[in-house]
């Protein structure tokens, strides 16, 4: 056991984490150069395309050092803010972490968040400066940033280039000498932490575990502690990107995959504890929670008969990603669909893209919303995710909305524009710190609702892509909020309702009806597009009717004849207006997203 090292890699997107993992794998000789594909650790196509790691992957490597065989378990973690829960459970399975920072870009916001998780878990952190082959690399500046922001001594930081392979050997030797071996206790009751789970078409739901105490052998009966369900261990193996290595037993301190023959990943929830039935652990491993959805959106199939296909697709995705929540909902405008909960915006994009790509569905997504707490006058508290569920104004005492702590690192030349954007988004400054004269760290408390629409895109375009951003939820706070409804031809369009701050309601309403006017097709009768709060109309635009020349068939003749025809047309239009239906195109639902 003293020769096992469990470690993970912490890095911001694009700082070269997956490439570094590939280099370490090939240096240990786990995969021959012929079979080595870029980003071995990333298994989903969408991960390779977007260059991000979504699911935590693992690999067991063997390395000979000072005439002793060592086992290195590399546990890959996602770098993106939405997947910080996956990061926390991956890091809890390790004794050490490599903090990878790009030599040309320096420390970024998401790196800080993940380092703090590692420090909370008392991991040994090894600073690694990557991409030293780049002409723009500034190693001393990056060392200063790591020491200033994170407070880790960088005098012995390891400089590598994952692309060319410089410094990789030295890095592996540092992992062996610096990261402690797992503390183990073979005699204690078995405790194993599930830090990832996925679905395999042949073997069912698989649990990737780190054994803390005791051991697990094939054919033993195990107990999953949160559900109290019992299962027989059908198979055990060590993780490997190409072909898993079978084993009869997982000892304490080891990382491995358990096959229990389950049909559903929800039965092996990430963060749960597995123990043996015959010698049960007294308590589960602490510090874990179920992944919570923060952002909600309605997903509707464009072809209404595809509703069941969408349900099947969501069921299948749920097998692999237990953090998605969904329930059926109906909309008068869009028909049948689902209200789906996501970990964050990137997660929402990835899921929508996977539904469209892997299951050939065409989907309409409504504007993303967050959870609101509604305190009613009768003392009842409601939690709603859909604006159309908001009770009437006279029944509401006050509304609370979720706030997040946003951390932003930006070049100082963009600071003014950025602060203007944050103030417009109702942000409150908590801290401002100059890391170097050229880079600033900002901390803001900001309502989650202001971030979910298009904040990230605006931040990137204001700072030419140089700023980085991360957020974590803090609490619910009272807000002066109202529901803005959109009426088209007198009918409420429920899918376009949004909850907005009272002071922005008027301008938002005006912008929305203006945007809608451009999109709604002209009808034979005039169509009014109105924005309302409760029963009060606050903005209105008219879509002019298409003219039809009813007097064309009169050749000369009496003016009263023409008047009679025009009066008749007026009557017809009035009747049509009363019963006419307007079909809204897909762009109308997207226009809500583009309003600032």
From Swiss-Prot:
Protein keywords: Cell inner membrane, Cell membrane, GTP-binding, Hydrolase, Membrane, Nucleotide-binding, Protein biosynthesis
Localization (cell): Cell inner membrane
Record Pfam families: EFG_C, GTP_EFTU, GTP_EFTU_D2, LepA_C
InterPro entries named in the record: EF-4, EFG_III/V, EFG_V-like, EFTu-like_2, G_TR_CS, LepA_C_sf, LepA_CTD, LepA_IV
Domain tr-type G span(s) in chain numbering: 2-183
GO molecular function: GTP binding; GTPase activity; ribosome binding; translation elongation factor activity
Disulfide-bond pairs as recorded: none
E.C. numbers: 3.6.5.n1
Enzyme class: hydrolase
Ligand binding (GTP): 14-19, 130-133
A GO biological process held by the record: positive regulation of translation
Cellular compartments per GO CC: plasma membrane
Main location: membrane
Topology versus the membrane: Peripheral membrane protein
UniProt catalytic activity: GTP + H2O = GDP + phosphate + H(+)
Family listed: Belongs to the TRAFAC class translation factor GTPase superfamily. Classic translation factor GTPase family. LepA subfamily.
Function description: Required for accurate and efficient protein synthesis under certain stress conditions. May act as a fidelity factor of the translation reaction, by catalyzing a one-codon backward translocation of tRNAs on improperly translocated ribosomes. Back-translocation proceeds from a post-translocation (POST) complex to a pre-translocation (PRE) complex, thus giving elongation factor G a second chance to translocate the tRNAs correctly. Binds to ribosomes in a GTP-dependent manner.
Annotated PANTHER family: TRANSLATION FACTOR GUF1 HOMOLOG, CHLOROPLASTIC, TRANSLATION FACTOR GUF1-RELATED
Name used for this protein in its record: Elongation factor 4
UniProt source species: Campylobacter lari (strain RM2100 / D67 / ATCC BAA-1060)
Gene this chain is encoded by: lepA
